UniProtKB/Swiss-Prot annotation:
InterPro entries: TLDc_dom (IPR006571). The keyword DNA-binding does not apply. It comes from Eremothecium gossypii (strain ATCC 10895 / CBS 109.51 / FGSC 9923 / NRRL Y-1056) (Yeast). It comes from the Eukaryota. It is found in: Cytoplasm. One of its GO terms (biological process) is protein-containing complex disassembly. One of its GO terms (cellular component) is nucleus. Residues 280-505 form the TLDc domain. This is Restriction of telomere capping protein 5. The keyword Cytoplasm applies. Keywords: Cytoplasm.
């Protein structure tokens, strides 16, 4: 009966894939999975798993680790990746408890690639968030073997009867998932990249970044131990994937499709290289976290160090000299320690006391910090600026792409809602995002922080991030459904440890900037070596313009 039912299946989105028994259903989707591969991919798949091994044979943990070059004892490998293979072996019966097979691994490769998943399931789109949460959740009771009919379409659409809206997954599993995804985000340059087990030895460092992502879903999670007693809902996970870390799955398909390349066609070239420039903020780990939001190829290959306050000095004028010639987008990074007690700091630091007189701090009743913010003092912010920097002592600059990003202790995204939205005040006002210009007068100074704003004082010693809700130039935060006790307003006042600006952009922007620098250097050289023979009109014109002469070397204008 099962064979007769499957022989009449048509593969269109309007057809019904119905089967009279479980084995016929699984056999059909196994055969369909193999048909998704080209002849070359099928050959490579069989070469990798072993010429004499059938795809339906059992796959143990060590064999899977060998296939992908990952140590079998890494927690995310055993608790996440191997679980995916186990649960998808009998797809679309995801609650079936059959032993994992190589066919299950092939289905993982197909279902985590958008195009392949759409063809395999005959759906225009496939919700990765739903699939991941369903796989991480404990399996429910499998289908009754005595049912009269297995409906393949219904099993796919409902993920084998999973109530997605009611899903709750242990937070520790989501933490393992993020650690897995972050490690391959940094490592995988392409789908034919060969990875070494030694690359995954420092997975604990990635777990610390993963905690920042996890806290964006649940701000009551402070440490790994908290994750063992918390759960993440589908609404939280889907909201985070939509607006906090939209690129977190970008490298998963590349990692999985290593299976479709034979050894001679693979490369050990990695996406990242060890950071050459000295930086206390911008490390490969931080770039990996930032690549959950921005294209990772630009972050790992096209970042240009422009200004590091720890080396060049905490100075607005040095910032201006180092950054203002860069005509492509930039990212400003600020790291610091949250000031917990203003009174104690004021007694030790008179400059901070003066700053508080200029900057109207929130009242205690309005200061409602989340638990993870209260427990974690180290803060990191990144601000993406597309417009070239310029001095604006009266007006503002910055377009709708300006984005304030909190990276630690949790990741939150604050997008521009109005433009312009930035000032660089060179007469004592400092740097501000989301605020109107401060009032700087001989009698005193006054800041006017916006509802969602980030302010750096002119000495680059203190910074303040304020979030009191809607109504400002920036959104109030990422669109993750929050529990009822979520703080409505808060302010982070921090003592700056370091401040850096890095040029950002694709290869085209980088080449244009290099060409501009080369042109400016050539022009400066021409001016410097103009002959000073009597009657030289060029020299006279340049002296009149104040470009050369009077002890000036003739640098770029």
């Amino acid at each position: 009966m099962g064979q007769r039912a499957s022989s009449h299946v048509t593969e269109t989105t309007t057809s019904r894939w119905t089967f009279t028994d479980r084995d016929a259903l699984i056999a059909f989707f196994n055969a369909r999975a193999l048909r998704q591969l080209s002849a070359v991919e099928q050959w490579a798949f069989h070469q990798n798993i072993g010429k004499n091994i059938e795809p339906t044979e059992e796959l143990d943990l060590q064999a899977l680790a060998t296939l992908y070059g990952v140590p079998a004892d890494v927690p995310w490998f055993t608790e996440v990746f191997y679980t995916f293979v186990c649960r998808l072996t009998s797809f679309p019966l995801m609650n079936d408890c059959s032993p994992p097979t190589y066919m299950g691994l092939l289905k993982v490769c197909l279902l985590f690639n958008k195009k392949r998943a759409a063809r395999y399931t005959a759906r225009k789109s496939y919700d990765v968030a739903s699939l991941v949460l369903a796989l991480l959740a404990p399996p429910r009771d499998a289908c009754d073997e005595n049912v009269d009919q297995f409906d393949g379409d219904k099993l796919i659409d409902t993920l084998d009867g999973t109530f997605i809206a009611e899903l709750e997954v242990p937070a520790i599993k989501v933490l393992r998932l993020f650690t897995f995804l972050l490690q391959i985000l940094q490592c995988c340059d392409g789908s034919n990249t060969t990875l070494s087990p030694s690359m995954f030895a420092d997975w604990e460092q990635y777990e610390q970044i993963s905690l920042c992502l996890l806290r964006s879903l649940d701000s009551t999670i402070v440490s790994r131990s908290d994750a063992r007693s918390r759960s993440i809902t589908y609404q939280q996970f889907a909201g985070g994937l939509r607006s906090v870390f939209p690129n977190v799955f970008d490298a998963l398909g590349l990692f999985l499709e290593r299976l479709f390349y034979v050894k001679r066609d693979t490369t050990n070239k990695l996406l990242y290289t060890p950071t050459k420039e000295t930086s206390t903020i911008v490390t490969n780990l931080l770039l990996t976290q930032l690549s959950t939001l921005y294209p990772r190829i630009n972050l790992f290959t096209s970042m240009q160090r422009l200004f590091v306050a720890g080396d060049a000095g905490f100075s607005m004028s040095v910032f201006q000299a180092k950054v203002f010639k860069w005509m492509a987008p930039t990212i400003l990074f600020v790291s610091g320690t949250r000031i917990q007690d203003d009174e104690i700091v004021c007694t030790k630091n008179k400059r901070y006391k003066a700053f508080l007189q200029d900057y109207p701090a929130l009242k205690d009743a309005e200061q409602q910090l989340a638990l993870c913010d209260r427990k974690k003092r180290n803060l990191i912010y990144a601000i993406f600026v597309r417009d070239p920097w310029k001095i604006t002592n009266k007006d503002l600059f910055g377009d709708m792409d300006t984005t304030i990003i909190q990276l630690a202790p949790r990741q939150k995204i604050f997008k521009a809602q109005e433009a312009p939205n930035i000032y660089f005040n060179a007469v004592g006002g400092g740097i501000g995002f989301g605020s109107s210009q401060p009032s700087v007068k001989p009698a005193g100074k006054r800041y006017f922080p916006g509802n969602v704003s980030f302010t750096v004082d002119p000495s680059m010693e203190f910074a303040v991030f304020r979030n009191v809700g809607d109504g400002g130039m920036f959104s109030h935060g990422s669109a993750v459904p929050a529990p009822a006790e979520q703080p409505l307003s808060y302010e982070h006042r921090l003592m700056i440890k370091d401040l850096e600006v890095w040029g950002y952009g694709g290869e085209e922007e980088l080449q244009k900037q290099i060409q501009r620098w080369q042109w400016e250097e050539a022009e400066a050289t021409k001016r410097k070596y103009i002959k000073t023979n009597g009657g030289n009109e060029d020299r006279a014109l340049l002296e009149m313009a104040g470009i050369v002469g009077h002890y000036q070397s003739g640098g770029s204008v």
